[in-house]
Amino acid sequence: VPIYVTENGAACEDILETDASGNMRVHDTQRIQYLADHLEMCAQAINEGVPLKGYFCWSFIDNYEWSFGYSKRFGIVYCDYETQRRIPKDSAFFLRDVIAGYGD
């Protein structure tokens, strides 16, 4: 029976900062480490013969969580709830690079 990880993510303290170029950034190193650790375990499971066929990160974008409302941010894309502006977090770039390198 194939296995799919359908919701894996972490609410971390995301602090919106302005970098030297004036761009808004979120340096979410805790989330990156969390995702890296879980992806490493997924790879290990596959190498050991587990039929893991898919992995879905929770969540693409910050959203309303039933248990926490808007107080916790799980997304790899920061959402300014007042303006709806979206800013990719460092974890989004991390996952982009992981996906781009898949199979290497």
Language-model features: locations:
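Non-catalytic scaffold segments within catalytic domains of secreted glycoside hydrolases
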Residues: 1-104
